Amino acid sequence: MADDAIKNITVRDVVRPLVATFATSLGQKTRMHSIIIRVRLKNGAEGLGECPTSFVMPNENAQAIRGMIEASRPGLIGRNVSEYAGMAIELRRKYPQMPMTASGIETALWRAWLKFSGKDEWKWFGGASDAIETDITVPITRDEAFISGWIGRAVRMGFKTYKIKVNGDTEKDHWLIGRVVALLRHTGKEFSLRLDGNQAFSVQSCLGLCEHVNREGYPVELFEQPLKRDDLHGLKELTRFSPLPVILDETVFSRRHLETVINEGLGHGVNIKVAKSGITESLAIVDLAKKNRMKLMAGCMIETMTGLSAGILMAMGTDAFDHIDLDSIHYLHHRNSYGDIGIDGACYRRVNRKS
């Protein structure tokens, strides 16, 4: 067995309460549940990856994640970790309904390979920038006290961009957006908004909300995934008529999906998440999107810094993203640093530049 051969793969569950109920059009949760993967090589080098659970992939639950890892382990043990990209392709082909698990495994393999090779994650991504600033998500709610507290906390932490979850209920969406705007305007500080429909809208209801926010003069930058992920006809129509850029999330998990989007004219940009696409495929999507002058957003699931850090370092290292949506750690109790990443409110900074 070569020194870079995979010796062992272990998993553990992480279940943590959220500091606020995370509610979208797809559901709500008060705690997060991820499976953490540890890959150990013959020479002792290790890498960690995270497989989160999400409303987006309800069948990819903790039990299913563990089952896939257990079934995949025999085919991975003994192989050279430098083949991580090929192994990820194999896993995605064999388990097409388990993209986040394949991504978590790939991230752990990739990190073990980096450790074995003496490479730094940030530098491997390009080392282009050492700081990024994220937005923060405002969940669907009618709780006046919560909204006031959540926005007040975010303002004190230095957030300037707010991604509001909406669900196609006209009255509720108007109230929530209006309340957030009123609270932010009261601070006297500049701010911007993003809307995230999580597949809850029709073409007409989306255009109606776009018209409303424009009429009210709200500073909205974009509308993320308003329609069903596979509503290609609707996305094409919406892309043509929407006054706001349409950013696709659930519609794009792979470069093949993005090729369809580009060829059919289905959106103005894409939300790239390491948690859903992994390392190799995420970078391929970045490259393809840039070549076609699409807007790029760096996003995440509800995940710990084990998984989120890969997205942060990708965004920093490539400096390729127009929008940063890497805020999941702010739904958890957390420290002010993780490895070489410092966490200062809305800002992530690389704090160790010796490597």
Task: Please annotate each region the language model reported.
Residues 111-115, 287-290, 312-316:
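Short glycine/serine- and small hydrophobic-enriched flexible loop segments
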Residues 4, 157, 218, 265, ...:
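Structured loop/turn residues at beta-strand edges in well-structured enzyme cores
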Residues 302-355:
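C-terminal alpha-helical cap/extension of soluble enzyme domains
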Residues 2-193, 198-207, 211-214, 241, ...:
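N-terminal capping/lid subdomain adjacent to the active-site entrance of alpha/beta enzymes
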Residues 164, 170-301, 305-309, 332-343:
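Catalytic core of soluble alpha/beta enzymes
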Residues 78, 119, 244, 294, ...:
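Short glycine/serine/threonine/alanine-rich loop segments
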Residues 136, 271, 325-326:
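Structural signal for conserved beta-strand scaffold positions within catalytic alpha/beta enzyme cores
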